[in-house]
């Protein structure tokens, strides 16, 4: 029996992809309710727009940085609503955690929670303060992830409280800071094409192949000539190579000068980027979508039964 596709499911997929409602319903029906498969089907039918929109995240929180000499800490702390991200106690907690990470070098989240901290009459550990603030503010909050950099030169950039970047480098500090800003703006996934994770390359190749097959089917139905297998293969490979250039830092067009790539700019500045780390608030976290209509209906039903 085919899975029933509800209006709520269609609305959730549309919110993630920006695709038309009817296309979302068709994709969910074809995917038998599988959201990930439906997203890929939309990418095949609608191109990269759906894929780009699907990368947007909605979970709340802050990303913050702390420095101690040459050492740097990058931390993400999540909460339930945007309102709390502006709360003074929450922000002070986030900054205190980052400072604790850069000074204490905890091995993992458990060790981070055990670090000494006292604030707002809570303590004596980070975990005690976290629990205390949950009670005080009335929202759940978690320390999601952190990274400490202590291997040498590190440039950093914060875009508000939602995006943080740390770049480890050798050479010119100003150039490295420009790269950190570039990473925040362009969001590469790897230093070079060769460093792009194999699973991402395979997924992109699969999408390109499915798009080519879809186009061939449309052409055949319209009585138009279908491209040869050789041309299709070149087209798929061309799409993959284009993707690799778009997501690898060295190959991206430099955000401050569209006449050169990041790699060309770095060569001019005699600078080498050893690694970069990008934190985006809520990246990969699904935010709960409230069904207000269902909630109101439930309240009405409860009132009638009272």
Curated annotation (Swiss-Prot):
Name of protein: Elongation factor Ts
One Pfam family recorded for the sequence: EF_TS
Biological function: Associates with the EF-Tu.GDP complex and induces the exchange of GDP to GTP. It remains bound to the aminoacyl-tRNA.EF-Tu.GTP complex up to the GTP hydrolysis stage on the ribosome.
Gene Ontology, cellular component aspect: cytoplasm
Protein location: Cytoplasm
Family: Belongs to the EF-Ts family.
Statement: the UniProt record of this protein carries the keyword NAD: no
Region (Involved in Mg(2+) ion dislocation from EF-Tu): 81-84
An MF annotation (GO) of this entry: translation elongation factor activity
Keyword Membrane applies: no
């Amino acid at each position: 029996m085919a899975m029933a596709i509800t209006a709520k499911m269609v609305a959730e997929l549309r919110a993630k992809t920006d695709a038309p409602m009817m296309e979302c319903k068709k994709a969910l029906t074809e995917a038998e309710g599988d959201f990930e498969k439906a997203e890929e089907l939309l990418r095949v039918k609608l191109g990269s727009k759906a894929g780009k929109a699907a990368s947007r995240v909605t979970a709340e929180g802050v990303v913050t940085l702390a420095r101690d000499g040459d050492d740097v800490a990058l931390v993400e702390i999540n909460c339930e609503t945007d309102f709390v991200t502006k709360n003074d106690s929450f922000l002070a907690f986030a900054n205190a955690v980052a400072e604790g990470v850069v000074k204490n070098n905890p091995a993992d989240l458990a060790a981070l929670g055990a670090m000494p901290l006292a604030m707002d009459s809570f303590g004596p550990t980070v975990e005690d303060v976290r629990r205390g603030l949950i009670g005080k503010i009335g929202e759940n909050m978690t320390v999601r992830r952190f990274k400490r950099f202590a291997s040498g030169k590190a440039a950093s950039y914060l875009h508000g409280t939602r995006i943080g970047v740390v770049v480890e480098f050798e050479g010119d500090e100003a150039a490295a800071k420009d790269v950190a800003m570039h990473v925040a703006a362009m969001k590469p996934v790897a230093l070079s094409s060769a460093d792009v994770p194999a699973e991402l390359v395979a997924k992109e190749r699969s999408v390109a192949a499915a798009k080519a097959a879809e186009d061939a089917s449309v052409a055949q139905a319209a009585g138009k000539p279908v491209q040869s297998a050789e041309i299709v293969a070149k087209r798929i490979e061309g799409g993959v190579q284009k993707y690799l250039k778009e997501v690898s830092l060295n190959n991206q067009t430099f955000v401050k000068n569209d006449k050169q790539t990041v790699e060309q700019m770095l060569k001019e500045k005699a600078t080498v980027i050893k690694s970069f780390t990008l934190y985006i608030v809520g990246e990969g976290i699904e935010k709960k979508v409230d069904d207000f209509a269902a909630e109101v209906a439930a309240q009405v039903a409860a009132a009638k039964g009272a």
